[in-house]
Amino acid sequence: MRSPPELALSIQLGDGSPACPVSRPRLRRWVLAALQNDARLTIRFVGSREGRRLNRDFRGRDYATNVLTFGYEDDGTQGPANARGRSRSGAAPARPVVADIVVCLPVVDREARAQRKPLDHHLAHLVIHGVLHAQGFEHDDEVEANAMETLETALLRRFRIADPYLPAPSASADRRGARTRAPAR
Protein backbone atom coordinates (compact mmCIF):
# COMPACT_ATOMS: atom_id res chain seq x y z
CA MET A 1 0.00 0.00 0.00
CA ARG A 2 1.27 3.43 -0.96
CA SER A 3 1.95 5.90 1.85
CA PRO A 4 0.04 9.19 1.84
CA PRO A 5 1.68 11.97 -0.14
CA GLU A 6 3.95 14.42 1.65
CA LEU A 7 2.73 17.99 1.51
CA ALA A 8 4.57 21.25 2.06
CA LEU A 9 1.73 23.78 2.14
CA SER A 10 2.15 27.53 2.35
CA ILE A 11 -0.83 29.84 2.87
CA GLN A 12 -0.60 33.49 1.81
CA LEU A 13 -2.93 36.46 2.02
CA GLY A 14 -2.55 38.93 -0.83
CA ASP A 15 -3.18 42.66 -0.66
CA GLY A 16 -6.86 43.41 -0.30
CA SER A 17 -7.73 39.84 0.60
CA PRO A 18 -10.13 39.19 3.43
CA ALA A 19 -8.98 36.68 6.03
CA CYS A 20 -9.31 33.05 5.02
CA PRO A 21 -12.69 31.80 6.28
CA VAL A 22 -11.41 28.30 7.18
CA SER A 23 -8.56 26.96 9.29
CA ARG A 24 -5.20 25.85 7.94
CA PRO A 25 -5.78 22.23 9.08
CA ARG A 26 -9.06 22.16 7.17
CA LEU A 27 -7.41 23.52 4.00
CA ARG A 28 -4.69 20.89 4.40
CA ARG A 29 -7.27 18.08 4.62
CA TRP A 30 -8.93 19.26 1.40
CA VAL A 31 -5.58 19.42 -0.40
CA LEU A 32 -4.48 15.98 0.83
CA ALA A 33 -7.77 14.44 -0.27
CA ALA A 34 -7.07 15.47 -3.87
CA LEU A 35 -3.32 14.92 -3.86
CA GLN A 36 -1.89 11.87 -5.58
CA ASN A 37 1.83 12.64 -5.23
CA ASP A 38 4.12 14.58 -2.95
CA ALA A 39 3.67 18.31 -3.41
CA ARG A 40 4.94 21.77 -2.60
CA LEU A 41 1.90 24.03 -2.89
CA THR A 42 1.08 27.60 -2.05
CA ILE A 43 -2.52 28.68 -1.71
CA ARG A 44 -2.73 32.45 -2.03
CA PHE A 45 -5.97 34.16 -1.11
CA VAL A 46 -6.38 37.42 -2.99
CA GLY A 47 -8.79 40.31 -3.37
CA SER A 48 -10.58 41.25 -6.58
CA ARG A 49 -7.89 43.61 -7.85
CA GLU A 50 -5.07 41.04 -7.66
CA GLY A 51 -7.35 38.29 -8.96
CA ARG A 52 -8.28 40.40 -11.97
CA ARG A 53 -4.66 41.34 -12.68
CA LEU A 54 -3.48 37.73 -12.56
CA ASN A 55 -6.33 36.50 -14.75
CA ARG A 56 -5.67 39.28 -17.26
CA ASP A 57 -1.88 38.86 -17.30
CA PHE A 58 -1.82 35.06 -17.50
CA ARG A 59 -5.06 34.14 -19.24
CA GLY A 60 -5.93 37.28 -21.18
CA ARG A 61 -9.29 37.61 -19.41
CA ASP A 62 -9.90 40.99 -17.81
CA TYR A 63 -11.96 39.98 -14.78
CA ALA A 64 -11.34 38.37 -11.42
CA THR A 65 -11.98 34.64 -11.49
CA ASN A 66 -12.53 32.21 -8.63
CA VAL A 67 -9.37 30.07 -8.85
CA LEU A 68 -6.17 30.04 -10.89
CA THR A 69 -3.52 27.33 -10.83
CA PHE A 70 0.09 27.98 -11.78
CA GLY A 71 2.16 24.83 -12.15
CA TYR A 72 5.95 24.89 -12.06
CA GLU A 73 8.64 22.61 -13.36
CA ASP A 74 11.28 21.23 -11.00
CA ASP A 75 13.68 23.99 -12.06
CA GLY A 76 11.21 26.66 -10.90
CA THR A 77 10.12 27.79 -14.36
CA GLN A 78 6.44 28.24 -14.91
CA GLY A 79 4.74 25.73 -17.12
CA PRO A 80 1.15 24.80 -17.72
CA ALA A 81 -0.50 23.21 -14.72
CA ASN A 82 -0.58 19.91 -16.57
CA ALA A 83 3.09 19.92 -17.59
CA ARG A 84 3.94 17.10 -15.23
CA GLY A 85 3.45 14.31 -17.72
CA ARG A 86 -0.01 13.12 -16.76
CA SER A 87 -1.23 10.73 -19.39
CA ARG A 88 -4.69 10.83 -20.91
CA SER A 89 -5.49 7.86 -18.66
CA GLY A 90 -5.03 10.15 -15.67
CA ALA A 91 -1.92 8.39 -14.33
CA ALA A 92 -0.32 10.50 -11.63
CA PRO A 93 3.04 12.11 -12.30
CA ALA A 94 6.07 10.49 -10.68
CA ARG A 95 7.74 13.69 -9.48
CA PRO A 96 6.44 16.11 -6.85
CA VAL A 97 3.77 18.59 -7.81
CA VAL A 98 4.88 22.21 -7.45
CA ALA A 99 2.18 24.86 -7.90
CA ASP A 100 0.62 28.08 -6.72
CA ILE A 101 -3.16 28.08 -6.38
CA VAL A 102 -4.71 31.54 -6.29
CA VAL A 103 -8.19 31.87 -4.79
CA CYS A 104 -10.06 35.15 -5.17
CA LEU A 105 -12.16 35.22 -2.00
CA PRO A 106 -14.57 38.00 -3.06
CA VAL A 107 -15.45 36.04 -6.20
CA VAL A 108 -15.80 32.78 -4.25
CA ASP A 109 -18.03 34.50 -1.69
CA ARG A 110 -20.20 36.07 -4.41
CA GLU A 111 -20.55 32.73 -6.23
CA ALA A 112 -21.41 30.86 -3.02
CA ARG A 113 -24.17 33.35 -2.23
CA ALA A 114 -25.54 33.26 -5.79
CA GLN A 115 -25.52 29.45 -5.74
CA ARG A 116 -26.93 29.33 -2.19
CA LYS A 117 -24.06 27.19 -0.96
CA PRO A 118 -22.14 27.48 2.28
CA LEU A 119 -18.95 29.44 1.64
CA ASP A 120 -16.76 26.67 3.06
CA HIS A 121 -18.34 24.11 0.70
CA HIS A 122 -17.68 26.25 -2.36
CA LEU A 123 -14.16 26.99 -1.14
CA ALA A 124 -13.47 23.26 -0.62
CA HIS A 125 -14.61 22.60 -4.18
CA LEU A 126 -12.34 25.28 -5.63
CA VAL A 127 -9.30 24.23 -3.58
CA ILE A 128 -9.77 20.63 -4.73
CA HIS A 129 -10.33 21.87 -8.29
CA GLY A 130 -7.06 23.82 -8.15
CA VAL A 131 -5.13 20.87 -6.71
CA LEU A 132 -6.42 18.64 -9.50
CA HIS A 133 -5.32 21.21 -12.09
CA ALA A 134 -1.88 21.27 -10.44
CA GLN A 135 -1.69 17.52 -11.09
CA GLY A 136 -2.63 17.83 -14.74
CA PHE A 137 -6.39 17.43 -14.75
CA GLU A 138 -8.16 19.63 -17.29
CA HIS A 139 -11.70 20.35 -18.46
CA ASP A 140 -11.01 21.49 -22.01
CA ASP A 141 -13.44 19.03 -23.55
CA GLU A 142 -16.53 17.18 -22.37
CA VAL A 143 -14.74 13.90 -21.61
CA GLU A 144 -12.08 15.64 -19.49
CA ALA A 145 -14.68 17.84 -17.81
CA ASN A 146 -16.85 14.86 -16.87
CA ALA A 147 -13.87 12.95 -15.48
CA MET A 148 -12.70 15.92 -13.43
CA GLU A 149 -16.20 16.73 -12.16
CA THR A 150 -16.78 13.10 -11.16
CA LEU A 151 -13.53 13.04 -9.18
CA GLU A 152 -14.26 16.41 -7.54
CA THR A 153 -17.71 15.22 -6.51
CA ALA A 154 -16.32 11.98 -5.03
CA LEU A 155 -13.64 13.86 -3.09
CA LEU A 156 -16.14 16.41 -1.76
CA ARG A 157 -18.46 13.60 -0.67
CA ARG A 158 -15.73 12.54 1.82
CA PHE A 159 -16.36 15.86 3.58
CA ARG A 160 -20.15 15.53 3.34
CA ILE A 161 -20.29 18.28 0.72
CA ALA A 162 -23.00 18.00 -1.93
CA ASP A 163 -22.31 17.67 -5.65
CA PRO A 164 -21.29 21.21 -6.65
CA TYR A 165 -22.54 20.72 -10.19
CA LEU A 166 -26.15 20.16 -9.23
CA PRO A 167 -28.36 23.24 -9.12
CA ALA A 168 -29.27 24.75 -5.77
CA PRO A 169 -32.40 23.19 -4.21
CA SER A 170 -34.44 26.31 -4.94
CA ALA A 171 -33.57 26.26 -8.66
CA SER A 172 -36.49 26.16 -11.05
CA ALA A 173 -37.87 22.76 -12.01
CA ASP A 174 -36.66 23.03 -15.61
CA ARG A 175 -33.04 23.18 -14.33
CA ARG A 176 -33.24 20.18 -12.04
CA GLY A 177 -30.66 17.62 -12.94
CA ALA A 178 -28.73 19.98 -15.21
CA ARG A 179 -25.03 20.23 -14.39
CA THR A 180 -23.28 23.56 -14.44
CA ARG A 181 -19.90 24.02 -16.11
CA ALA A 182 -16.66 23.55 -14.25
CA PRO A 183 -15.26 26.66 -12.56
CA ALA A 184 -12.74 28.84 -14.34
CA ARG A 185 -9.17 27.95 -13.73
What is each of the regions a protein language model found here?
Residues 1-123, 132-185:
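An acidic/histidine-cluster motif and surrounding catalytic segment
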Residues 126:
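Residues within the DNA-recognition helix of helix-turn-helix
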